[in-house]
Amino acid sequence: DLSQYRCLWTLSIDGKQKDQGEITLPGVAPGESETIPLPASIAGKKASAKPTSDLRLTISFILKRDALWAKAGHEVAWEQFCIQEGAFLSSKLENRGRLKVREDEEHLSISGSGFSIQWEKNATGSLTSLTYHGKEILAHPADFPLQPITQAFRAPTDNDKSFGNWLAKDWSLHRMDNPRISLDFLKHEIREDGAVIVRVQTRNRYKEGMIVTKYLYTILSDGTIDLKTTFQPQGILPELPRLGIAFCLSSDYRTFIWQGRGPQDNYPDRKTSAAVGLWKGSVADQYVHYPRPQDSGNKEEVRRLMLTDR
């Protein structure tokens, strides 16, 4: 019987709530069904939205009155619908100023308006410094020797150790946790508009295979740094536990904002209970203290991510 519920709707664009309202429910008896029209304003919002925007409609049913088991306003069911899926756009990397470039046998340094970035031209081509307005962004713990680092390994979980331990065993046999990393080249060029292009290529060597990583940095005078990464597997490799690059940032950046599923952690096989939206939390809270250590803090369908010191 729908008479005991209120039906609320919200429309979000790119993770931000833009409109909301309530739908009057008809008297539908148990076991029966009826089609309920949506407000016309939803179609109007879709028509006026950018074709690249992400639109989500969330329908929620809440109790009208107190019940023995819950108070009025308690949500008993919800569902989210994708009205228009947002498009990923290529960055418009237009430079409007000049950059200073310094290079010697050991370092490549580039600086602009209030920022500087430096690479070490050693065996790995690691980033050694990234500062904005005098504040260092990167951290350099002893167990994180270079940045960015190609990561194709993670600690095995219970699932990886099941079925005869085959996944974790393969990773160990191929030495996925201990690659030998070398630098092929680190070079730069200056575009006609003054932007600096830095190309870095590294190799992660494992027992019988390797992963070649190509980094393409585009650096603008306002401090924008666009990084595109390409991975090329070669030789014999096991099923990879993961693949990506990792940076280690200063602990000052403790606030985590993302557009994607949340706010709780979610995974490919457990994500429909997490709505797509614009969420905010602390970095420390993303870790879940399970009785046995497992994956935690994962977020699915993330379109953008911000870390801030505020």
Q: What is the predicted function of each stretch?
A:
Residues 7-71:
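Intrinsically disordered, low-complexity Pro/Gly/Ser/Thr-rich segments with frequent PxxP/GP/PP motifs
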Residues 18-20, 71-78, 83, 137:
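Local beta-strand/beta-hairpin segments that build beta-sheet-rich folds
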Residues 5-7, 245-246:
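Aromatic-lined ligand-binding clefts that engage carbohydrates, nucleic acids, or primary amines
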Residues 1-5, 236-239:
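A short beta-turn/strand-edge loop motif at beta-sheet boundaries
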Residues 39-52, 65-67, 80-310:
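Beta-strand/loop-rich accessory regions of lumenal/periplasmic or secreted enzymes
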